[in-house]
């Protein structure tokens, strides 16, 4: 049984070179949203006890009907 010649593989390195771009100094008015408010999301986005949306209200009502205590 003869073995076919395997092609030689060159040393493969990670291609981690990136193109360098010139630094641009943009005016602040061009780099920020013109909302007049520096908050991009609701301040209570992670509050679990807010419960004022329709889904939460319906879920609470359904849980009360079933007699399940909600946390």
From Swiss-Prot:
Q: Where is this region: UBS-II?
A: 16-25
Please, which domain of life does this record's source organism belong to?
Answer: Eukaryota
Stretch list, region UBS-I: 38-49
Gene Ontology molecular function: molecular adaptor activity
- Tell where it localizes: Cytoplasm; Nucleus
Which keywords does this chain's UniProt record carry?
Cytoplasm, mRNA transport, Nucleus, Transport
Pfam families in the record: DSS1_SEM1 (PF05160)
Keyword Phosphoprotein applies: no
Q: Which residue stretches does the UniProt record annotate as biased composition, category Acidic residues?
A: 11-22
Q: Which residues form a coiled coil?
A: none
Span list, region Disordered:
1-38
Could you tell me the Gene Ontology terms of the biological process aspect for this record?
A: double-strand break repair via homologous recombination; mRNA export from nucleus; proteasome assembly
Q: What is its main location?
A: cytoplasm
GO CC annotation, single: nucleus
Its domain description in UniProt is: Two unstructured ubiquitin-binding sites (UBSs) mediate interaction with ubiquitin. UBS-I is the strong and UBS-II the weak binding site.
State what this protein does: Versatile protein that might stabilize multiple protein complexes involved in diverse pathways. Subunit of the 26S proteasome which plays a role in ubiquitin-dependent proteolysis. Acts as a ubiquitin receptor of the 26S proteasome, by interacting with ubiquitin chains linked by 'Lys-63' and 'Lys-48'. Involved in nuclear export of specific sets of mRNAs. Links the mRNA adapter mlo3 to rae1 for targeting mRNA-protein complex to the proteins of the nucleoporin complex (NPC). Involved in recombinational repair of DNA.
As for family, the record states: Belongs to the DSS1/SEM1 family.
State whether it acts alone or in a complex, and with which partners, per the record.
Answer: Interacts with mlo3, rae1, nup98/nup189 and nup146. Interacts with rad24. Interacts (via UBSs) with ubiquitin (ubi3/ubi5).
Q: Could you tell me what this protein is called? A: 26S proteasome complex subunit rpn15
Q: Which gene encodes it?
A: rpn15
């Amino acid at each position: 049984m003869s073995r076919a010649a395997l092609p030689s593989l060159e040393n493969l390195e990670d291609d981690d070179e990136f193109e360098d771009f010139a630094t641009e100094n943009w005016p602040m008015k061009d780099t920020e949203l013109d909302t007049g408010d520096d908050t991009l999301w609701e301040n209570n986005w992670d509050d679990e006890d807010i419960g004022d949306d329709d889904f939460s209200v319906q879920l609470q009502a359904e849980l009360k009907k079933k007699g399940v205590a909600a946390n």
